[in-house]
Amino acid sequence: MSFLVAIVGRANVGKSTLFNVLTNSHDALVFDFEGVTRDRQYGQAKYDDLDYLVVDTGGISDKDVGFDEFMAKQSQIAIDEANLVFFVVDGRSGLTTGDEYVASLLRQKDKKVVVVVNKVDGTDEEAAMAEFYSFGFDKVFAISAAHRRNTQKLVDKFLKKPLNEYYQDYTQTQEHKEQQRHGIHFSLIGRPNVGKSTLTNRMLGEDRVVVFDMPGTTIDSVSIPFERHGQKYTIVDTAGVRKRGKVKQTLEKFSVIKTLQAIQDSNVVVAVVDARQGISDQDLSLIHFAIKNGRALVLAVNKWDGMTEEDRIQVKQDLKRKLFFLQDYVDIHFISALYGTNVGHVFESIDTAYACANKKITTADATRLMQLAVEAHSPPMVGKFRIKLKYAHVGGHNPPVIVIHGNQVSRLPNSYKRYLENFFREALDFRGTPIVFEFKQSENPFADRKNKRSKDEGSKSKKVK
């Protein structure tokens, strides 16, 4: 589970600009389905090789007309779940009643808060910050997000220490969790009302009743261990598990943050799509996030029952067009969670994806496959020289990481990298899991000796003169 930074504040103070600086913007996940604000953004960021999540909560106000209940709930969740809060204010406008309202909400929380005074370019920083100390938060810092002024200092000063402390504790906790982990850890992800709760109950068994709502918690993800045909599993539920008869046709409780964290904590992710609504940009955002995090993936297209043959053909065509990037390596199952149709096949794909993601490959096998790939299709020329791949080894599992050493590997085109991925995938029969390739420049073990010899020869020539 990643460290979470929440960016909060009233509208138009520069929250999105700061979000873009922290996440490099292209990593943003924007969700606009019902129950989640259209401008809500979630992104991944990195500091010294440590990953963390960033959420831009959108403008918070007590006066917005039609301020949606779910919009407020998502902002509340973001603040409640955050390890660190960046409370952004406008240094040019000065302190406003809107800022006071946000500050009053944050004072009710036991959170680490940094008041980030934005838009201070062309102004006296100390003067701009002065009035914001009245909020009662002891950490106040001035930046210009648009010009990236002091943004790195902001991260160095306020994020570095808590982030490192979090991952020290998290690593120890995670090691304990791994020891206690019950079989294959998988999660069901998807938009609200696609049938995640119905599918969860179907997987757990008809008479299984799980209490979801925990005292004092807005939305909790619950890990539920169970066993099927001798195989142990743990399902991570983020929507709430209810007895079948008590599932109402209302909008599910939904937390994007919980969903992203569930993806990171899973071995396998089952993306649930509503066949009657089709696959949306939000579905694609969640799938891309899962792949980027190296999770094994299975796709379950729910509510397949009762559809006409014509509609089914249309759905399959849309899936093929929108999921082209999965390169046919992810199993797609057309199911009815309500009636249990094909749910057993989903379990089979979970087992297969998990096995492939954790498959043991020796250095000899990895190198042999690399050599076969090169023999079938050599790397391209770089100037007068051909890129040379020397040997390969496994660098990790879940996802499988193949490390290839060679010369000029930094110039290897993406097309050849895709070729290698497809070659390895076919040769190893990898289903359901992404494969990560890392390319490392081989070091010349005689380089230092050669340089030393050159220096010695140079000094000798000077003496001769």
Curated annotation (Swiss-Prot):
It comes from the Bacteria. InterPro entries: G_ENGA, GTP-bd, GTPase_Der, KH_dom-like, KH_dom-like_a/b, P-loop_NTPase, Small_GTP-bd. GTP 1 binds at residues 9-16, 56-60, 118-121. One of its GO terms (biological process) is ribosome biogenesis. GTP 2 binds at residues 190-197, 237-241, 302-305. Gene3D superfamilies: 3.30.300.20, P-loop containing nucleotide triphosphate hydrolases. Residues 3-166, 184-358 form the EngA-type G domain. Residues 446-465 are annotated as: Disordered. The keyword Lyase does not apply. Residues 359-443 form the KH-like domain. Associates with the 50S ribosomal subunit. Belongs to the TRAFAC class TrmE-Era-EngA-EngB-Septin-like GTPase superfamily. EngA (Der) GTPase family. GTPase that plays an essential role in the late steps of ribosome biogenesis. This is GTPase Der. The gene is der.
